[in-house]
Amino acid sequence: MKRLFSLVFIGCFLFCIQANGQGTLSQAKAEPGNRLPGFAVNPISGEQEKVFVYAPGINIHINAPSESLFDGNKPTKLVLYALPNGNSTAWTIGKAPEEGDDWHFHIQNIGAQTRYLRATARDCNWVTVYLEADSKSWGRWRKAGPMRDYKIKETVEYLLALFSEYNPHIELNSHSGGGNFIFGFMDANTEIPGYVKRISFIDSNYNWDDKRYGNKLKQ
């Protein structure tokens, strides 16, 4: 049953992000073979990664293509992925199966799906941004302090600005309770900004309010 759920989830994620086909990293565009400033190179995959906490309590893990694949002349898709309740970033990325693994490692596999997209859809730079609330619940995080929705908006704008030299746009994605991140972003904006090209809910639209959000999506 867990394997079936994993396969269904993978199909949903790939469909959601492929359906339609401010500080900066650098003052000059990266050419293929160049390193993104401030990023570490994963010794196993070669992917470029940046991990940090954006106050208050937003754990961010950015996974960008390897030096040889990142092309500053191509547009950059920033796929923001708000984690489901109770899940860690490591679980969400996934890993090769080993005996004794926690089963959570094998139900999302966003890391493998990202690599698949990079290998098959080469018209852009695929950058996956994992967004984990320190409370492991975006709903709880939003209620933990004032102006939290505007902090979500600020976080999205910061990430966009970080890649401003590379023709970026934002694609908002969420799984389960991660939908609260998207609703917080929508609540903080009077209309959906033009830099957001797609919004996807993977079983995460529990708090949907048609009057509150419907018109914003129609615009």
Task: Specify the residue positions occupied by each region the protein language model found.
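Bacterial N-terminal signal peptides that target proteins for export
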Residues: 1-8
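Bacterial N-terminal signal peptides
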Residues: 8-16
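A domain-start/cap signature at the N-terminus of enzymes
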Residues: 21-78
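Short, surface-exposed "cap/lid" segments of acyl-processing enzymes
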Residues: 55-61, 66-123
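Alpha/beta-hydrolase active-site loop
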Residues: 111, 130-165
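Gly/Ala-rich beta-loop-alpha elbow adjacent to hydrolase catalytic centers
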Residues: 174-178, 182
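Active-site signature of alpha/beta-hydrolase-fold catalytic machinery across serine-
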Residues: 184-188
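The feature captures the conserved acid-bearing segment of alpha/beta-hydrolase catalytic domains
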Residues: 190-219
